[in-house]
Amino acid sequence: MGVLTFRDVAVEFSPEEWECLDSAQQRLYRDVMLENYGNLVSLGLAIFKPDLMTCLEQRKEPWKVKRQEAVAKHPAGSFHFTAEILPDHDIKDSFQKVILRKYGSCDLNNLHLKKDYQSVGNCKGQKSSYNGLHQCLSATHSKTCQCNKCGRGFQLCSIFTEHKDIFSREKCHKCEECGKDCRLFSDFTRHKKIHTVERCYKCEECGKAFKKFSNLTEHKRVHTGEKPYKCEGCGKTFTCSSTLVKHKRNHTGDRPYKCEECGKAFKCFSDLTNHKRIHTGEKPYKCEECNKAYRWFSDLAKHKIIHTGDKPYTCNECGKAFKWFSALSKHKRIHTGEKPYICEECGKAFTRSSTLFNHKRIHMEERPYKCEECSKTFKCFSDLTNHKRIHTGEKPYKCEECGKASSWFSHLIRHKRIHTREKLHKC
């Protein structure tokens, strides 16, 4: 009988050794360990999940778990395979094909770290050994994970795992406290904190509670209006230091968060998280009314207004209500007279960017919209739409008084004056 422990496919790091690896190598380490464990599971050899796996799934540093507990907490964590489970001639073949199929000629010893490193300086050899593993993997690591549902390929198995959850009908992670189901383990971990974290610092103004006193202090500035963090570049002030750090990247152009799939970089980690959904196809925000799903919460919030008919944004001047704040902002320019969009050719100003765009065609003499019936061209798409009614005979504007229909809205307005005159002269 052969015995295979998780240590046989595990790499162990001290804090000093971990610091010697760059971010790409750290990501590679996570992917290798998670993939190896997943392959053990697929062979039916993994009985218990080591703490190291839980640590890696939560993107924590691997050395923060006690070394012995991380890879050998349970005696049953040793994986036994006998002739009844796997015949002797299958053990080598199955293990090499499944566990090592992506690592080419890499020996298992390449996945083990020497234990005689006593200082940061000594771990340079460790890093070069890991670089060897990186080189061996890089040749076969491009788009190695392919989805059998939609055929998409992924460079990183962590992204592939998230993508696979989209097709899973069952929401596999269930909260024992409230019964909520989560598809992604990361979402499940985040949700559990609602129940486990004790929030002992409470705001006296609004009753909101926080787990840290520093968070409460930052929150209080919402009520006081205090903005102690000032940008030296432009003088803008902020309530939180983290917001100032993000703002400074506008001046420096720094984009520290890079997408591993397409290489696009972002200023904020939240922007990178949102962007990744383009690659994974994940749409976590679902409408309860029509089941339509969205990648971003802001899109779901806009969509919900269709069902509710709610118009939460009201103009203080005339009382007109709007579904979206952007529409209210544009409307307010009617009252203020603000015209922020100026033509560089003639200096004429406009309230909307779309109006300026249409105006610029006067100078360029561009008429991009052509009628397929008579070949007449127009500067604006709306003019082409109005013109087409000559050919179709469509009359969408109907008078409520007499039922007469008109092709254009301006004709309906002119027609309505007939009825208003009749009412004025009627005794």
From Swiss-Prot:
Family per similarity comment: Belongs to the krueppel C2H2-type zinc-finger protein family.
Organism of derivation: Homo sapiens
SMART domains, per the entry: KRAB, ZnF_C2H2
Main location: nucleus
The name this protein goes by in its record: Zinc finger protein 736
CDD domains: KRAB_A-box
GO annotation (BP), single: regulation of DNA-templated transcription
Any Gene Ontology CC annotation: nucleus
InterPro entries found in the cross-reference section: KRAB (IPR001909), KRAB_dom_sf (IPR036051), Znf_C2H2_sf (IPR036236), Znf_C2H2_type (IPR013087)
Compartments it resides in: Nucleus
Gene: ZNF736
Zinc finger (C2H2-type): 145-167, 173-195, 201-223, 229-251, 257-279, 285-307, 313-335, 341-363, 369-391, 397-419
Single annotated GO MF: RNA polymerase II cis-regulatory region sequence-specific DNA binding
